[in-house]
């Protein structure tokens, strides 16, 4: 059921952008750091995917995560790895339902978004 097709609209008639608060910035910073570590190590990005509970610890909410996925800033998958496997394994999903073993990575679009959001917060602070 999708009844929430309406968006908030500002006085100019433009769709209002969501507030990028400190919790979202902290989550983006953690996801971006994992992305950079994977690149630096020459590893598969998914080997550095972050478990959702670590993202919740930054103050991210389930709505934040759903928004990141819906905007295609983040990808997610259910981890199906076994102890001792040389690499982590995931069952990828595009949906907005997450299970306890869901992990997240930034997409290329998300890396760009995170860089801008974090740069803006540094310039403002």
Predicted regions and their residues:
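Long, charge-rich, low-complexity alpha-helical segments
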Residues: 75-76, 86
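Short amphipathic alpha-helical interface segments
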Residues: 2-70, 77-78, 93-102, 114-121
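Minor-groove-contacting beta-hairpin "wing" of winged helix-turn-helix DNA-binding domains
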Residues: 82-90, 103-105
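Short, intrinsically disordered terminal segments enriched in charged and Pro/Gly residues
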Residues: 124-125
């Amino acid at each position: 059921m999708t009844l929430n097709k309406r968006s908030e609209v500002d006085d100019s008639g433009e769709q209002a952008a969501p507030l990028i608060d400190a919790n979202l910035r902290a989550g983006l910073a953690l996801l971006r750091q994992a992305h950079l570590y994977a690149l630096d190590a020459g590893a598969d990005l998914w080997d550095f995917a972050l478990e959702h509970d670590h993202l919740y610890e930054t103050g991210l909410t389930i709505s934040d995560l759903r928004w990141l996925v819906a905007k295609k800033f983040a990808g997610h998958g259910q981890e199906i790895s076994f102890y001792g496997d040389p690499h982590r394994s995931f069952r990828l999903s595009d949906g907005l339902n997450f299970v306890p073993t869901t992990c997240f990575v930034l997409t290329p679009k998300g890396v760009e978004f995170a860089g801008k959001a974090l740069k803006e917060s540094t310039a403002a602070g």
